[in-house]
From Swiss-Prot:
Originating species: Xanthomonas campestris pv. translucens
Name assigned to this protein: Ice nucleation protein
GO cellular component: cell outer membrane
Listed Polar residues bias regions: 270-282, 302-325, 356-373, 449-469, 502-519, 594-613, 642-661, 689-709, 738-757, 785-805, 833-853, 929-949, 977-997
Region Disordered, annotated ranges: 130-195, 270-329, 356-378, 449-474, 502-529, 594-620, 642-668, 689-716, 738-764, 785-810, 833-860, 929-959, 977-1004
Topology in membrane: Peripheral membrane protein
Lineage of producing organism: Bacteria, Pseudomonadati, Pseudomonadota, Gammaproteobacteria, Lysobacterales
Domain notes: Contains 153 imperfect repeats of a consensus octapeptide A-G-Y-G-S-T-L-T; further on a 16-residue and a regional 48-residue periodicity is superimposed.
Amino acid sequence: MIVEKILALRTCANNMADHCGLIWPMAGPVECKFWKPSGLHENGLTGLLWGKGVGAHLSAHADARWVVCEVAVDEMLQLAEEGMIKFPRATVLFVGNRSQALDYIAANMPLYGAALQLAAPAAPAHVHMPAAEPSAPATQATSATLPTPATPSTQATPSTQSTQSTQSTEATQSTEATPVATVAAAPPPPGQQHDVMAKKTETGVYGSTLTGADQSRLVAGYGSTETAGDHSDLIAGYGSTGTAGSDSSILAGYGSTQTAAGRSTLTAGYGSTQTAQEGSRLTSGYGSTATSGSDSAVISGYGSTQTAGSESSLTAGYGSTQTARKGSDITAGYGSTGTAGSDSALIAGYGSTQTAGSESSLTAGYGSTQTARKGSDVTAGYGSTGTAGADSTLIAGYGSTQTAGGESSLTAGYGSTQTARQGSDITAGYGSTGTAGADSTLIAGYGSTQTSGSDSSLTAGYGSTQTARKGSDITAGYGSTGTAGSDSSLIAGYGSTQTAGSESSLTAGYGSTQTAQQDSSLTTGYGSTSTAGHDSSLIAGYGSTQTAGYDSTLTAGYGSTQTAQQDSSLTTGYGSTSTAGADSTLIAGYGSTQTAGSDSSLTAGYGSTQTAREGSDVTAGYGSTGTAGADSTLIAGYGSTQTSGSDSSLTAGYGSTQTARKGSDVTAGYGSTGTAGADSTLIAGYGSTQTSGSDSSLTAGYGSTQTARKGSDVTAGYGSTGTAGADSTLIAGYGSTQTSGSDSSLTAGYGSTQTARKGSDVTAGYGSTGTAGADSTLIAGYGSTQTSGSDSSLTAGYGSTQTARKGSDITAGYGSTGTAGADSTLIAGYGSTQTSGSDSSLTAGYGSTQTAREGSDVTAGYGSTGTAGADSTLISGYGSTQTAGSDSSLTAGYGSTQTARKGSDVTAGYGSTGTAGADSTLIAGYGSTQTSGSDSSLTAGYGSTQTARKGSDMTAGYGSTGTAGADSTLIAGYGSTQTSGSDSSLTAGYGSTQTAREGSDVTAGYGSTGTAGADSTLIAGYGSTQTAGSDSSLTAGYGSTQTARQGSDVTAGYGSTGTAGADSTLIAGYGSTQTAGSDSSLTAGYGSTQTARQGSDITAGYGSTGTAGADSSLIAGYGSTQTAGYDSNLTAGYGSTQTAREDSSLTAGYGSTSTAGHDSSLIAGYGSTQTAGYNSILTTGYGSTQTAQESSSLTAGYGSTSTAGYDSTLTAGYGSTQTAGYKSTLTAGYGSNSTAGHESSLIAGYGSTQIAGYESTLTAGYGSSLTTQQNSSLTAGYGSTEIAGYASTLMAGYGSSQTAGYESTLTAGYGSTQMAEHSSSLTAGYGSTGIAGQDSSLIAGYGSSLTSGVRSFLTAGYGSNMIASYGSSLIAGHECTQIAGHKSMLIAGKGSFQTAGARSTLIGGAASVQTAGDRSKLIAGADSTQTAGDRSKLLAGRNSYLTAGDRSKLTAGDDSTLMAGDRSKLTAGKNSVLTAGANSRLIGSLGSTLSGGENSTLIFRCWDGERYTNLVVRTGEQGVESDIPYQVDDEGNLVGKADDDLVLDYDPGMILDGQCSPGTGEELRDV
């Protein structure tokens, strides 16, 4: 009994390595060097106790080794997994497969004391394994010991020491005849019921047949046949046939045939045929055929045919054919054909054909054809054709054709054709054609054609054609044509044509044409044409033409033409023309022309022309012309002209002209002119002119002029002029002037002037002036001054004193004193004192004192003091003091002090102080202080301080400070500070600081700071800082900083920074930074940074960075970076980077990068990169990369890469790569690759590759590859490859390949291959192959193959094959083959084959075969075959076959065969065969003599009268001596010819049947 020990089961890899890399022994102790007693699997050895538990950590590989080891109990740790233990060391007792290991544990458990404590049955233990591959068989050849449960002699016996194992003592007798070892199994131990499997190992020799039992290992030789039972391992030789049971592993040679049961592993050689069942894994060689059951994995070679059951995995080589059922996974090589059942996944190579069942996934290579049913997922390569069932997803490559069932999703490459049914989703590439059923979604590329059923959604690329039925949604690219059924929605690109059914929605791009029926909605781009049915909605772009049925809604862009019928609504852009039916609504843009039927509503933009019938509503923009029918309503913009029928309502903007008939209602804007018919109502804006018929009502704004006839009602605004006919009523605003006819009623606002005739009624507001005719009535407000003619009525305010001449009207306030001249009007406040000359008008507040000369007009606030010269006008606030010279006008706020000289005009706020020179104008806010020279004009806000010299004009906000020189103009915001020299103009926002020298013009926003030199112009946004030299012009946005020298012109956006030298021009976007030298011009977008030296011109987009030298010109897109030397010209797209030295010219697309030396010219497409030395010219397409040294010229298509040395010229197509040294000329088609040294000339077709040394000339067709050293000339057709050394000349047809050393000349036809060393000359026809050494000359016909060493001369006809070493001369007819060593000469007729060593001479007739060693001479007639060793001489007749060793001489007649050893001489007659050893001479014919050296074989061909026989004798045997001539006599005896005839008693060793026995000729040739 073994105590304190247990058995553990574990697995290792086939090389006995565990997962940590430790190599376990086949038997004996093993230990972990990094032991840690933790609960983790790391840092220790693991296994299952007694082989029971969860086997998740055991290997599932078929070739895994199952190890049983012995472990000490006290060193064992229990892990978390059921049955898993960990230990630091163990002793390996057994290695085998799974079943063997479990049998071993079950057999040996009774020997262990620890096992007796387990409550487990004695049956074998079982390991719960996950689903895995079948285990590999264990064989005697793969284990150190092969134990069985009952044979201690064949297994390691557990012991207390656990360190020893008993080796097998059974020996295997091995013999040559039977190389099979058999080990028999002993009976199992008592109590154990296990199947005992025979263990067998068989090794087969050449052509052997092997049959093995179960669990056998068979190794088979060439062409063997194997048959093995279960759990076998077979290794098969060439052409073998293997049949193995389940759980077998087979490795097969070339051309083998294999049949394996389930759970097998098969690896097959070239051309093998495999058949495997369930759970098999097959790997097959080239051209193999594999048939596998379910759960199989198949990997097949080139051209293989595979058939796999369900849940299989197939990987196929080139051109393979695959068939797989349910759950299969197929990966197919080039040109393969795959057919898979449901739940399959197929990945197919180029040109493959795939057919998959439901729920399959197909991925196909180029040109593949795919067919998939329900639930399939198809991804197709270029030109593929895909047909998928319902619930399929197809992604197709270029030019593919796809057909999918319902609920499919299709994505197609360029030029694809798609057909999909219900619920499909299609995304199509360029030029694709898509047809989809109901509920489909189509997205089509450029030029695609789409046809979709109901409830579809189509999105089409440029120029696409779309047709969709009910419920479709179409989005179309540029120039597309869309036709959609009812409930459709169409969005069309530029120039598209759309036709939609009822309830459709159309959105069209520029220039599109749309046709839609009932309930459609159209949105059209620029210049589009729309025709929509009833209940439609149209929105049209610029210049569009729209025609809509009734109940339509039209919105048109600029210049559009619209025609709509009943119940339509039109909104038109600028200059549009609209014609709408009854009940229509029109809104027209600027200059539009509208014509609407009855009950229409028109709204017109600026300058529009409107015509509307009965019940129309017209709203017209500025300068519009409106003509409306009866019951119309017109609202007209500024300067509009309106003509309206009866019962119309007109509302006109500023300066409008209105004409309205009976029952019209007119409302007129400023300066409008209104003419209204009877029963009209007119409301006129400021300065409007109104003329109204009888029973009209007029309401006029400020300064309006009104003329009204009988029964009119006029209400006039401030300063308005009203003339009303009989029975009129006038109400006039402040300062209005009213003239009224008889029986009129006038009511005037404050300060209004009223003139009324007989029977008039005048009511005047405060301070109004009323002049009334006879029978007039005047009511004067507080302190009003009234001058009234006879029979006038004056009403005076409280306490006023009124003095009026005849006909005057006086209204005086209480306590006021009024002295009025004749015809004067006095309005006096209470307690005021007024002294007025004749024709004066005095209005005084209470307690004020007014003194006025004749013709003066004084209006004084309470307690104010006013002194006015003649013809002066004073308006005083309360407590103010005013002193005015003659002809002056003073208006003062309360408490202000005003002093004005003659001819001044002063308006002062309360508490202000104003001092004005003669002829000055002062307007002062409260608390302001103003000092003005003569002829000045000052306007000051409250608290401001203004000081102005003679002739200045100042307008200041509150708290501002202004100092102005003579003849200056200052406008200051509140809190601003302005200092101006003479003849300057300053306009400042609040808080700004402005300093300007003489003759400057400054306009500043709030908080800005401006400093201007003389004769400068500054316009500053708020918070900006501007500093300008003399004669400069600065315009700055808010927060910008501008600094400019004299004569500069700066325009800056907000937050920008500009620094300009003298005579510079800067235009900066917001946030930009500009620095310019003198005489420069900078224009920058927002956020850009520009730096320019003198004389530069920069125009930059937003975010760009520009640095320019003197006299440079930069134009930059947004985000671009430009750096230019002096006298350069740069034009950059957005995001580009430009760097140029002096005198350069750069034009770059967006995102491009250009670096140019001086005197260079660069034109770059978007995303291109250009680097040029001085005096270079570069022109590149988008995405190209150009690098050129000085004086180079590069022209490149998009995506190309060019690198040129100085004085080079490169012209590249798109996607090409060019590299050239100095003074080179390269011209490349698209996709080509050219590399040239200096002074080279390269011309390349598209896709070609050229590499040239200096002073070379290369001309290549498309797709060709040329490589040359210096001074070479290469000319190649398309697809050719040329490699040449220096000073070489190569000319190649298309598809040819040429390689030449220096100073070589190669001329090749199309498809030929040429390789030559230096100083060689090759001329080859099409399809030929030429290889030449140095100083060689090769001339080859088409399809020939020539190989030559140095100094050789080869001339070959078409289809010939020549190989020559150096110094050889070969001349061959067509279809010949010549192989020669150095310094040999070969001449061959048509169809000959020649092979020669060095210094040999071969002359062969047609269809001859010659093979010679060194220094040989062979002369052969036609159809001869010669084989010679070195320095041999052979002379043969026709159809001879000669084989000789070194230094031999052979002479043969026709149809003879000679074979000789070294230094032999053979002479043969007709049809003789001679075979000799070394140093022998054989002569053979009918009755010929043969001589052989030592160990030679002599073959005699004899005729016995019935048939030929071959007699073979060997020297040294049976009395046949070496170097003795022999012959066969008539009796068939071998006769020696030494001295006398000697008849030998000879038993022939080999007699060959002469009746062409199979293999006879081949045997002789092999010998």
